[in-house]
């Protein structure tokens, strides 16, 4: 024998009208000493499902007065970014503009191929001026 219960929940909200949820619960009713309890078990089951569903949707609780400015305080979420905004180059200048004439910065000892001592001297700085 299957018992059907119609469970209506009124969820109070901080702003706006209360939200009304209606569930139909089917509970198989066994006969004998191991019989399933009636209406209280159905209500407890629905409340447990509703709480677990609600816990998965809520963000972490924030303490009042500890807003670090990282999250928007309004209810509207930020608009999703489009692909063109996400695919910017990591550096604003092309590769050659980041290099000094003698090769990569920080690699002053090894000059770029095809360049002489003058190219290296431009990268090394004041110690490469020679005697005097």
Swiss-Prot record:
Keyword Cell membrane: no
Comp. bias regions, Gly residues: 103-117
Subunit comment: Does not interact with cyclins, CDK1, CDK2, CDK4, CDK5 or CDK6. Binds to BCL6, E2F1, HUWE1, MDM2, MYC, NPM1/B23, TOP1/TOPOI and UBE2I/UBC9. Interacts with TBRG1 and COMMD1. Interacts with CDKN2AIP and E4F1. Interacts with CDK5RAP3 and MDM2; form a ternary complex involved in regulation of p53/TP53. Interacts with NOP53; the interaction is direct and promotes ARF nucleoplasmic relocalization and ubiquitin-mediated proteasomal degradation. Interacts with TTF1 (via the N-terminal region (NRD) and a C-terminal region); the interaction is direct and inhibits the nucleolar localization of TTF1.
GO aspect biological process, one term: protein K63-linked ubiquitination
Record-linked InterPro entries: Tumor_suppres_ARF
Ranges of biased composition (kind: Low complexity): 71-83
Pfam families for this protein: P19Arf_N
Subcellular location per the Swiss-Prot or TrEMBL entry: Nucleus, Nucleolus; Nucleus, Nucleoplasm
Function, in words: Capable of inducing cell cycle arrest in G1 and G2 phases. Acts as a tumor suppressor. Binds to MDM2 and blocks its nucleocytoplasmic shuttling by sequestering it in the nucleolus. This inhibits the oncogenic action of MDM2 by blocking MDM2-induced degradation of p53 and enhancing p53-dependent transactivation and apoptosis. Also induces G2 arrest and apoptosis in a p53-independent manner by preventing the activation of cyclin B1/CDC2 complexes. Binds to BCL6 and down-regulates BCL6-induced transcriptional repression.
Molecular function in Gene Ontology: disordered domain specific binding; DNA binding; MDM2/MDM4 family protein binding; p53 binding; RNA polymerase II-specific DNA-binding transcription factor binding; SUMO transferase activity; ubiquitin ligase inhibitor activity; ubiquitin-protein transferase inhibitor activity
Residue ranges, annotated region (Interaction with CDK5RAP3 and MDM2): 1-64
Name of the protein this chain belongs to: Tumor suppressor ARF
Principal location: nucleus
Superkingdom in the source lineage: Eukaryota
Biased composition (Basic residues): 84-99
Keyword Cell cycle: yes
Region (Disordered): 56-132
A cellular-component GO term for this protein: cytosol
Keywords, in A-Z order: Apoptosis, Cell cycle, DNA-binding, Mitochondrion, Nucleus, rRNA processing, Transcription, Transcription regulation, Tumor suppressor, Ubl conjugation, Ubl conjugation pathway
PTM section of the record: Ubiquitinated in normal cells by TRIP12 via the ubiquitin fusion degradation (UFD) pathway, a process that mediates ubiquitination at the N-terminus, regardless of the absence of lysine residues. Ubiquitination leads to its proteasomal degradation. In cancer cells, however, TRIP12 is located in a different cell compartment, preventing ubiquitination and degradation.
């Amino acid at each position: 024998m299957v018992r059907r219960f119609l469970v209506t929940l009124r969820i109070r909200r901080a702003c706006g009208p209360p939200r009304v949820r209606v569930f139909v619960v089917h509970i198989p009713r066994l006969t004998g000493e191991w019989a399933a309890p009636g209406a209280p078990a159905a209500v407890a089951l629905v409340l447990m499902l509703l709480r677990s569903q609600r816990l998965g949707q809520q963000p972490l609780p924030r303490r009042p007065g500890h807003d670090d400015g990282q999250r928007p305080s309004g209810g509207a979420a930020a608009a999703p970014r489009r692909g063109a905004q996400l695919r910017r180059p990591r550096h604003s200048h092309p590769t050659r503009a980041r290099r000094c004439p003698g090769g990569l910065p920080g690699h002053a000892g090894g000059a770029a191929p095809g360049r002489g001592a003058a190219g290296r001297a431009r990268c090394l700085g004041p110690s490469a001026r020679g005697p005097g």
